[in-house]
Amino acid sequence: MEPTTEIQATEDLTLSGDHAAASADSLVVDNANDNAGQEEGFEIVLKDDETAPKQDPAKNAEFARRRIERKRQRELEQQMEAVKRGELPESLRVNPDLPPQPDINAYLSEEGLAKYDYDNSRALAAFNAANTEWLMKAQDARSNAVAEQGRKTQEFTQQSAQYVEAARKHYDAAEKLNIPDYQEKEDAFMQLVPPAVGADIMRLFPEKSAALMYHLGANPEKARQLLAMDGQSALIELTRLSERLTLKPRGKQISSAPPADQPITGDVSAANKDAIRKQMDAAASKGDVETYRKLKAKLKGIR
């Protein structure tokens, strides 16, 4: 199947060492909430990009109808519910650190009895004393393990709740964007990275996680470069990339050229239109789809 969405980079992504970032393609995002006006959808692009090619609206409309599956959100919810039921993964299990249990043969053997002048009663008394001490230490170890198990479980549950909420916001944002083949690109990205990486991106970049995963899924070489970095360097690159990704309305170009002159006529409506357009551009740059659409409706009302 020929992809209908791409992401475009206008500069090399700076990487640590000798890593040179690959330039990205352009990404087109369809506005599926307005099937009658596919030309008025959105594109996710990197700032300063001016060369994003237009896509076939009919194909975009077809892909836009695909439902985002919220896979990672469901996985996180299922993991949290399993832990609440007591079904703990190995990573959460805490085993008691038990001391070695006394061996009666060490007391009643020829060598052991020699320590007690071959007196069986003395040897048995020594064994019973050692075993009683072991039972007390074992009980303490088990109590400590239970306490640590409870602490780890509570910590996991609290952290899981944060990840589930981050995943919910992530998919809510993805659905608002209505990226035609979003699920395909997210799946491609998730196959490249450990599950924890995707969850961390959702948590650390709540406003741009959907765009980041789409971009990296469409450009797997960038995802591989990030995986090759240490954690701090990868976080810096992800932050830089998130700042460059932006929305732009379909059919328009984001330009670094100075803004057009303000209307110099006495037409108040013309000035209002210009102000609303600027607000629309600002909302698009922030990825605020809801505000953009409200302003767009307001602009139509002035016309």
UniProtKB/Swiss-Prot annotation:
Annotated InterPro entries: Phage_P22_Gp8_scaffold, Virus_scaffolding_prot_C
Coiled coil: none
Region (Post-transcriptional autoregulatory domain): 1-74
Region span, Interaction with the capsid protein: 275-303
Induction data: The scaffolding protein negatively regulates its own synthesis when it is not assembled into proheads.
The keyword Metal-binding appears for this protein: no
Keywords of the record: Late protein
A Pfam family it matches: Phage-scaffold
Role: Required for procapsid assembly. The interior of the prohead is filled with the scaffolding protein. The scaffolding protein is lost from the structure during packaging. Scaffolding protein exit is followed by the expansion of the procapsid into a mature capsid.
Complex formation: Homodimer. Homotetramer. Interacts with the portal protein; this interaction initiates procapsid assembly, thereby ensuring incorporation of only one portal ring per capsid. Interacts (via C-terminus) with the capsid protein; this interaction allow to form the procapsid, in which the scaffolding protein forms an internal shell in the icosahedrally arranged capsid protein subunits.
The name this protein goes by in its record: Scaffolding protein
